[in-house]
Curated annotation (Swiss-Prot):
Chain sites annotated for binding prenylated FMN: I175, Y176, R177, R189, W190, L191, R194, G195
Compartment(s) where it occurs, according to its Swiss-Prot or TrEMBL record: Cell membrane
Lineage of origin: Bacteria, Pseudomonadati, Pseudomonadota, Betaproteobacteria, Burkholderiales
Gene, per the UniProt record: ubiD
Enzyme active site: D294
Pfam families in alphabetical order: UbiD, UbiD_C, UbiD_N
Name of the protein: 3-octaprenyl-4-hydroxybenzoate carboxy-lyase
Cofactor dependency: prenylated FMN; Mn(2+)
Binding site for Mn(2+): N172, E238
Alphabetized GO MF terms: 3-octaprenyl-4-hydroxybenzoate carboxy-lyase activity; metal ion binding
GO biological process: ubiquinone biosynthetic process
Family affiliation: Belongs to the UbiD family.
Oligomeric form and interacting partners: Homohexamer.
């Protein structure tokens, strides 16, 4: 589905019956969360709240509440079609020598297509039609959601954070939640391993005492948002990949107060800086963030993160505020992960051809548990795959549990997976434990914040050398009997 910006996408979703306008008054304080959560769990449409309590700005929620809408946002009709983008990313991440002239020409065509999708910079843009500066900068003027009763403050959730490290040509796009701290201040909760935090760390080391520019785009088009959460190779701009998804170049405009480039058709853009603060060990202003309800289904603990001071807010005329909540799966991040799972399969298969399928069940908080199907070739093969997944992509750095099964097990069917675990696993022999590894800061089960253990389960059939016993043979019915019974079955009317 081709579209230019979020508004165009909304119009097309409504035409497809994938968006519902909510004309009743609904409060950003808790009520939007409750209504979006109920709608998502029912497989319902995106919701456009046209009358948010206390505000004139409509709120868009549940945009990515189904895998189909994620697929539509990436320019295809079905989630199964996303593997084509996975093959593109695999070619770019780990390029191999072409196996022939035809493949060489195909790779050249891919590079040419990506080059043609380089972002286009505009001199002026809709996102700067209205400008708030000075005392006009007040986040209370925006319908920012307060998602859960125990949340300490309203929370910006779908903000596309734009940063750039010193001496880097490429800007980084990331989605990090932001706690509203004051009328013009938010807390930027980016984890140390994320791109925005790394850019900021480099700036702080090379330019101590100098403010660090940041922009946050709210209501960017879906392709740009999804490009920011996709494992794009470091050599490729997320803006460029968004153009590939959208089928047209991403249009950008220079921010008014820095050299950063922002999406030209974003609904709202927050421009500002992280300012120096000699009282903090980092040399920059920090504040205690949280607690907030998170995708784990719990409130997370508090921690210190940088304070982003907003110098100006630019926006389109009659802007739309794009928001979400996170909670016990399923939520929007879980639906995103379920769809993006299809991108990961070709990426992993390029590095590990023995992987025949890969699944991140949403019940596992989107990334904490992975089930891997392999074509086993030798003893210890499952363990090689476990270590490979943990180290190959940054997205799997925080995966706590990996279950590896043979290619006769349907990894998207829990009944089949549990059968494999209970019949093919000896807890002592087939459990791999790794201690003191990077763990999600939000994982309160780990003994130390950000550092914990991982577990791998080898639920494959065991080969000689892995067991001294005769291994069981799965029960199967003969093909001729199955065919005969099928004929009888058709006569029973069952």
């Amino acid at each position: 589905m081709a579209y230019r910006d979020l508004r165009d996408f909304i119009t097309q979703l409504e035409h497809l019956g994938e968006l519902k306008r909510v004309q009743a008054e609904v409060s950003p304080y808790l009520e939007m969360t409750a209504l979006c959560d109920r709608t998502l769990r029912a497989g319902g449409p995106a919701l456009l709240f046209e009358n948010p309590t206390g505000h004139n700005t409509p709120v868009l929620g549940n945009l990515f509440g189904t895998t189909r809408r994620v697929a539509l946002g990436m320019g295809v009709n079905d989630v199964s079609e996303l593997r084509q983008f996975g093959h593109v990313l695999a070619s770019l991440k780990e390029p191999e020598a072409p196996k022939g002239f035809k493949e060489l020409m195909g790779l050249g065509s891919l590079v040419k297509t990506l080059w043609a999708m380089a972002p286009k910079e505009l001199r002026s843009a809709p996102c700067q039609e209205i400008i708030w500066e000075g005392a006009d900068v007040d986040l209370a003027r925006l319908p920012i959601q307060h998602c859960w009763p125990g949340d300490v403050a309203p929370l910006i959730t779908w903000g596309l954070v734009i940063t750039q490290g010193p001496h880097k040509a490429r800007q980084n796009l990331g989605i990090y939640r932001q706690q509203v701290l004051a009328r013009n201040k938010v807390i930027m909760r980016w984890l140390a391993q994320r791109g925005g935090a790394l850019d900021f760390k480099e700036h702080a080391a090379l330019n101590p005492g100098q403010p660090y520019p940041v922009c946050v785009a709210l209501g960017a088009d879906p392709a740009t948002i999804l490009g920011a959460v996709t494992p794009v190779p470091d050599s490729l701009s997320e803006y460029q990949f968004a153009g590939l998804l959208r089928g047209s170049r991403t249009e950008l405009v220079k921010a008014l107060g820095s050299e950063l480039r922002v999406p030209a058709f974003a609904e709202i853009v927050l421009e500002g800086h992280i300012y120096p603060d000699a009282t903090h060990a980092s040399g920059f202003e920090h504040a205690l963030e949280g607690p907030f309800g998170d995708h784990t289904g719990y409130y997370n603990e508090q921690d210190w993160f940088p304070v982003f001071t907003i110098d100006r807010i630019t926006q389109r005329r009659d802007p739309i505020y794009h928001s979400t909540y996170t909670g016990k799966p399923p939520d929007e991040p879980a639906m995103l992960a379920l769809a993006l799972n299809e991108l990961f399969v070709p990426l992993l298969q390029r590095q590990y051809p023995e992987i025949t399928d890969f699944y991140l069940p949403p019940e596992g908080c989107s990334y904490r548990l992975a089930v891997v199907q392999i074509k086993k070739s030798y003893p210890g093969h499952a363990r090689r795959v476990m270590f490979g997944i943990w180290s190959f992509l940054r997205q799997f750095m925080y995966t706590k549990f990996i279950v590896v099964v043979d290619d006769d097990v349907n990894i998207r069917d829990w009944k089949d997976v549990i059968w494999a675990i209970t019949t093919r696993v000896d807890p002592t022999r087939d459990t791999l434990l790794a201690d003191s590894t990077p763990i999600d800061y939000l994982d309160f089960a780990s003994p130390v914040s950000g550092l914990g253990s991982k577990m791998g389960l080898d639920a494959t059939n065991k080969w000689p050398g892995e067991t001294s016993r005769e291994w069981g043979r799965p029960l199967t019915m003969s093909a001729d009997v199955t065919a005969r019974v099928e004929q009888v079955w058709q006569t029973l009317g069952l």
